[in-house]
């Protein structure tokens, strides 16, 4: 079962290293491919939602949000540019190339040689926000030949950032943490691996936001 990672020093070291890698990725995308992007951990900021399943490796789930690009519809080119840029950065840190999965780019598992030696990896989901405030994930469907690349709208994602901000302002973020943990474990126990961390996060924020009339 999932639980929140409590080792604050380890969390700080892990987030610092991976944050540097993500910053370098955004810089490389701009310099090499003229693509504007920003990044954030799912859950964002100091109140992130980093979970660990028992003693298994930790996945740091990042959204790489594309903010500027010449052709939004060439999804294959976008995925390839991000993959190539990510590999350039990973090699600079002595990491192996990333793996291209359906909805993310995943790194190898790493660990620190001193202190907490728990293994961790990075999962990067490429996203964009449309003019109506909906979020879309870049999907690489490998089941078809030729492979299909497309933007897939995340269900119920409209204005999710504003909803999360409202919840934090009302100091009810603990409710989101509770919901997120419950949802992740619910899908885990039912062997449902089709719901990414971002989808679970959207579900948690909406559940809490929609129950705001019942807040104490």
Regions found by a protein language model. Give the residues of each.
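Active-site nucleotide-donor binding segment shared across nucleotidyl transfer reactions
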Residues: 29-60, 64-73
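Charged/polar, solvent-exposed surface patches and flexible loops
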Residues: 16, 20-27, 31, 80, ...
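Predominantly extracellular/lumenal beta-strand repeat domains
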Residues: 47-49, 65, 80, 98, ...
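Helical scaffold of the NTase/Pol beta-like nucleotidyltransferase catalytic core
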Residues: 1-41
């Amino acid at each position: 079962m999932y639980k929140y990672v409590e080792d604050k020093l380890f969390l700080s070291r892990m987030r610092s290293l991976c944050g540097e890698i993500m910053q370098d990725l955004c810089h490389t995308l701009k310099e090499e491919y003229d693509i504007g992007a920003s990044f954030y951990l799912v859950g964002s900021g100091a109140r992130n939602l980093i979970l660990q399943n028992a003693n298994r490796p930790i996945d740091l789930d990042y959204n790489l949000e594309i903010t500027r690009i010449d052709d939004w519809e060439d999804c294959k080119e976008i995925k390839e540019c991000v993959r190539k840029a990510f590999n350039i950065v990973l090699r600079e840190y002595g990491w192996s190339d990333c793996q291209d999965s359906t909805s993310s780019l995943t790194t190898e598992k790493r660990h620190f040689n001193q202190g907490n030696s728990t293994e961790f990896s990075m999962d990067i989901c490429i996203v964009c926000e449309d003019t109506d405030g909906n979020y879309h994930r870049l999907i690489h469907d490998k089941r078809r030949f030729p492979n299909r690349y497309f933007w897939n709208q995340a269900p119920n994602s409209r204005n999710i950032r504003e909803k999360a901000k409202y919840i934090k302002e009302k100091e009810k973020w603990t409710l989101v943490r509770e919901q997120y943990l419950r949802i992740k474990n619910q899908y885990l126990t039912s062997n449902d691996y089709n719901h990414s961390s971002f989808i679970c996060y959207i579900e948690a924020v909406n559940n809490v936001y929609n129950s705001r009339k019942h807040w104490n």
